């Protein structure tokens, strides 16, 4: 039976909730996306844990079970990278493997630019290096939806009526095509989405995945990717909202990186093709 622990660590003056599965010095630290989407949807990755390999998940500041300060200026990706380093130190992870999903993939890249000496291997799971490129690709994906759905989106986006029931229904159709393609979404996925931290998400991101008007709308580190020297696996779904073009940009930028496209997956590859995804990550990390 895999050892499981949970608790809080104090990082940069705030309490952060973590969960640890498995044991040993070889660790995979997983960064959730959103920004503001708690760790639950990443739980399939804990199947990699055993007596010699540890998987650690945590909720970022303002998210899930972690402390929720009112100061919105604390929610930014640069501070987030320092927070990752604080978690590594607080849990005494030493040199670690790092996996970032979606926004967490962007956060992993930001972390690597400053702290890559602490990374053994890195997995960028449907992550991004440029918000502008990603928004452009998401806008393109919207044109693949039925015409009536596109018209509904245009109508309410022009009015900034992002909470209108008709608009939310259209967004839900987008998500079932490009976020998770399973006919019935798993409870852990629904829980992460239902418990999304609205202050974090709206402040950094915006009202939804493809309307990014928050503080990180101009974020782009593509030109600096060549500075990253750690072995890196870039994964993406064929139907991913953070598209293969975005993944290919990261792959081309990081010397020696490996790109793997999952042909039946949308954004949540660890759910859409769970068994194959875990196999690929396990092989890369040589767990």
Spans of features found by a protein language model:
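N-terminal cap/lid segment of alpha/beta-hydrolase-fold proteins
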Residues: 1-15
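Conserved HGGG/HGGXW glycine-rich cap/lid loop of the alpha/beta-hydrolase fold
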Residues: 14-68
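Active-site loop/oxyanion-hole signature of alpha/beta-hydrolase fold enzymes
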Residues: 57-103
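Conserved hydrolase catalytic core segment
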Residues: 94-137
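Flexible "cap/lid" loop of the alpha/beta hydrolase fold
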Residues: 121-162
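Alpha/beta-hydrolase
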Residues: 143, 151-230, 249
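Conserved loop-alpha-helix segment in the C-terminal half of the alpha/beta-hydrolase fold
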Residues: 215-265
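Catalytic active-site module of serine/aspartate enzymes centered on a nucleophile-bearing elbow/loop
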Residues: 256-287
């Amino acid at each position: 039976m895999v050892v499981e622990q949970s608790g809080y660590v104090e990082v940069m003056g705030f309490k952060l909730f973590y969960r640890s599965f498995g044991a040993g010095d070889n660790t995979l630290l997983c960064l959730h996306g959103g920004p503001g989407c708690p760790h639950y949807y990443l739980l399939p990755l804990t199947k990699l844990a055993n007596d010699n390999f540890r998987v650690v998940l945590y909720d970022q500041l303002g998210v899930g079970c972690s402390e929720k300060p009112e100061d919105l200026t604390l929610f930014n990706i640069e501070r987030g990278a320092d927070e990752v380093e604080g978690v590594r130190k607080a849990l005494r992870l030493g040199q670690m493997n790092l996996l970032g999903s979606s926004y967490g993939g962007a956060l992993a890249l930001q972390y690597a630019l400053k702290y890559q000496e602490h990374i053994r291997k890195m997995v960028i799971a449907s992550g991004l290096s440029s918000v502008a490129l990603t928004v452009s690709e998401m806008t393109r994906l919207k044109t693949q939806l039925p015409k009536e759905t596109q018209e509904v989106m245009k109508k309410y986006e022009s009015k900034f009526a992002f909470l209108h029931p008709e608009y939310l229904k259209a967004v839900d159709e987008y998500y079932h095509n490009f976020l998770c393609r399973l006919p019935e979404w798993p409870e852990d996925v629904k829980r992460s989405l239902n418990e999304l931290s609205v202050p974090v998400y709206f402040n950094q991101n915006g009202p939804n995945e493809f309307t990014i008007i928050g503080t990180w709308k101009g974020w782009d580190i593509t030109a600096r990717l060549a500075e990253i020297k750690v072995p890196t696996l870039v994964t993406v779904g064929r139907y991913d909202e953070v598209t293969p073009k975005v993944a290919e940009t990261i792959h081309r930028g990081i010397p020696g990186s490996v790109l793997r496209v999952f042909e039946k997956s949308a954004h949540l590859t660890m759910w859409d093709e769970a068994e194959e995804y875990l196999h690929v990550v396990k092989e890369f990390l040589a767990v």
